[in-house]
């Protein structure tokens, strides 16, 4: 091995394997694009995004870490969410939870 060398695993890597998912329609009702990061508590996203919020409590986007999803004005799309991991505590964001889920 050479220092700093990266030896990738053979085959595909499946993200969030085995986690329960929720898929729902999300629409941007605003006049500006809205971007949501991979680990943002989806329940607390911008109010310009219209969807069934209660279904998303404790959930995040099912996308690769460090990436984001952008919703253009007037755009509607299906999104898939997975549960937040760890201690299942949420602090910050829009301060709608501030504790255990």
Curated annotation (Swiss-Prot):
EC number(s) on file: 3.5.1.5
InterPro entries in alphabetical order: Urease_beta-like (IPR002019), Urease_betasu_sf (IPR036461), Urease_subunit (IPR050069)
Organism of this sequence: Mesorhizobium japonicum (strain LMG 29417 / CECT 9101 / MAFF 303099)
Name of the molecule in the record: Urease subunit beta
Keywords: Cytoplasm, Hydrolase
Pathway the protein takes part in: Nitrogen metabolism; urea degradation; CO(2) and NH(3) from urea (urease route): step 1/1
Pfam families: Urease_beta (PF00699)
Main location group: cytoplasm
Subunit and interaction comment: Heterotrimer of UreA (gamma), UreB (beta) and UreC (alpha) subunits. Three heterotrimers associate to form the active enzyme.
Location of this chain's protein in the cell: Cytoplasm
Molecular functions (GO terms): urease activity
Gene Ontology CC: one annotated term: urease complex
The UniProt record lists the keyword Hydrolase: yes
């Amino acid at each position: 091995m050479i220092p700093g060398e990266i030896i990738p695993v053979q085959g595909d890597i499946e993200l969030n394997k085995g986690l329960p998912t929720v898929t729902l329609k999300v629409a941007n009702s605003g006049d500006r694009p809205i971007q949501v990061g991979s680990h943002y508590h989806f329940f607390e996203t911008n109010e310009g995004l219209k969807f069934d919020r209660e279904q998303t409590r404790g959930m995040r986007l099912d996308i690769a870490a460090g990436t984001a999803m952008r919703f253009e004005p007037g755009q509607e799309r299906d999104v898939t969410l997975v549960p937040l991991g760890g201690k299942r505590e949420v602090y910050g964001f829009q301060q709608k939870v501030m504790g255990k889920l």
